[in-house]
Amino acid sequence: MPSSFFFEDASDDELELIRNQEDSSEEDVKEGEAEEHEAGEDEDGEEEYEEEDDDEEEEDEKRKRDADAQSPWDFASYSSSVGEEHARRHTTSIDEKISKAIQHRPVPISINEEEEEEEEEEDASDAETDKQEEYLSEDDEAAEYKPEDATPKPFFSTVDGVSFHADTFMELNLSRPLLRACETLGYKKPTPIQAACIPLALTGRDLCASAITGSGKTAAFALPTLERLLFRPKRVFATRVLILTPTRELAVQIHSMIQNLAQFTDIKCGLIVGGLSVREQEVVLRSMPDIVVATPGRMIDHLRNSMSVDLDDLAVLILDEADRLLQTGFATEITELVRLCPKRRQTMLFSATMTEEVKELVKLSLNKPLRLSADPSARRPPGLTEEVVRIRRTREANQEAVLLSLCTRTFKSKVIIFSGTKQAAHRLKILFGLAGLKAAELHGNLTQAQRLDSLELFRKQEVDFLIATDVAARGLDIIGVQTVINYACPREIDSYVHRVGRTARAGREGYAVTFVTDSDRSLLKVIAKKVGSKLKSRVIPEQSIVKWSQIIDEMEDQYSAVISAERDERALRKAEMEFAKAENMLEHRDEIYARPKRTWFMTEKEKKLVAQAEKDSAGNPAGGELVSADRAEDLKMKEKRKREREKNLPRKKRRKLEAAREMLEDNEGEEEEEDEEGDEKRGRSRGKDKKKQETDKKGLTLKDLGYMRAKAVKAKQRAIDSGKMERPKPDKKQSRSKPRNQPRGEEMKDLFKSDMGEKKQGRGGAAAAAKPRTKSKNSFKSKARYKRR
């Protein structure tokens, strides 16, 4: 059977058990259908006597039930943990601080009256506000935009005969427990990417799939994986599937969806992400879950330090949002995880913006992968309406007023606002709260529980606006999002596609509004040409912008009060943490020092190089040349070759190098602080001067010094041989040894003549030198006469 590609053949007892489970589940499905049919007949009989108002209410309730049934995830368990977290830390939420600031210094903001005035103004200025001009004409778009070649690269296998159409999930050879789960979640007809991927994934082929946002890519890899796990050897507990994602929220969503799809099976799934308890995750990994959904960093941490999991039995590796995982920052971690995985495995890559570069794919050791692209002609959702709001150079300071005017006039609920930075997201959250608008924030400065709580509040529609960074741009399936506002214009094409993909999902309609400054205008044109979308311009009344600018100026004092309260609370929290740490060290000193030190697969220097490469890559605008992951990989290989050369050194030299390196690592923190202070005083130096300053501060190791001297000697010798440099002349000041014109004895006599007597001086005269020297008679006497006879 194809589904047992990597697993042992199931025994007869196991197959019989699975058949019994499927038969029972089929009976349950039939019984449920019969009950629904009977209930439907009763309702049909009663509907004849009901009023029209009751029918509308029932339809609304039915829509709500359908929306709830299709929701793939639920973060309600984290809402209570946020309150416990604030109680444990003795802190208050940002909403409490905002309400307190409003009570102490209220500002007269009458949004309702303002809306009434604006509605009266809209009638007079309809020609201005509703006038929308195409940002790109159709002729320009047809001439300048050229769709990418859909032919597969030689690296990929051919996909002849692959069908992107299926009427029901039963046509995809799925078991009854999975069909029952799909029916419970409200999945009736497979999407094109699901119809193409599920049959191929069941055969164990490597896949590289892409489709538009909201097309059901998660179910496309989750359903075939669960189908294969139904036929696993159940007596052998092991982790057989690893799913990697770039963000924690996406990992939590995938974990929740897999649990819903596997609710009628015995398959276990574990969640391993940062921000949650490490000890609890170790317990989960020791139980050997069949599927692990993780972020790369935390998974490597457990593999190296917890000793509670290994990847020896891994059969399937899945990379969701693969293009982001293969970029700088994640590439080294993904390469390390792939190195730890068995070579005989199935690898699947999924993303809405999959690149055709094969360098990164080759690193993953893919085996003749299939390149699948559903809806290649539709580069964006068909129900998406894209608009731009131009921010003039003289009005860039009023961008917040433009946003508030837009959110109070046109888009009043189910809106995601991408702020660009964490600081901007937090400021907008406070301003929205002071203006009386219900909003939640989502960015990296929040704890993991707070981030998940914000998503849950927005999903339940308890707040109307979600102000987020690009953390929420990828993969999150939030049903009912009507509008996406790019408060900060995206710098890359992929970022724009993923941001606007949060709305108009699964055939629904949605709006995407982008704020464009003069510096972003040319960039957005490039994005529009390559994505293939037609952007239209929206004009906001000047009077509304001026009014909100005045309101924001009046709210600055309240904003400062909230920021001051947060700063004081943060300082108090830091002092409490330091006190608790010192107390814990005194109480559990021996236990803490007995723990092994946590390790990482990269040194501190390599971490800094990768971080710098990621920063350079993020700083380049879209359309420019991005810094690839090869730079970080080359730097890592250079360091590896240096370490290999060090191993061949003598033992004493090697020990000296290790000692020097340890001293440098210990003093890194102090040196960084000195560097920052120096940069603030003197300004940042560039090029060779900066390298020279860093070298002078940090010093050189013996190895580096030896390399530099050897290079200098070789360069000098090459210059002399080529004639570029004259051979150095000997130094005249250097003392030379004089040739000896007299014997050694005469020389010594001349030196010590004053200390010698006349008799000794006479022995060495000219006559003595001319007369041949003869032995004295008494110079040697034989001792033979003294011998015994």
From Swiss-Prot:
A motif (DEAD box) lies at residues 320-323. A motif (Q motif) lies at residues 167-195. Keywords: ATP-binding, Coiled coil, Helicase, Hydrolase, Nucleotide-binding, RNA-binding. Residues 638-656, 772-789 have a biased composition (Basic residues). Residues 402-546 form the Helicase C-terminal domain. SUPFAM superfamilies: P-loop containing nucleoside triphosphate hydrolases. This is DEAD-box ATP-dependent RNA helicase 28.
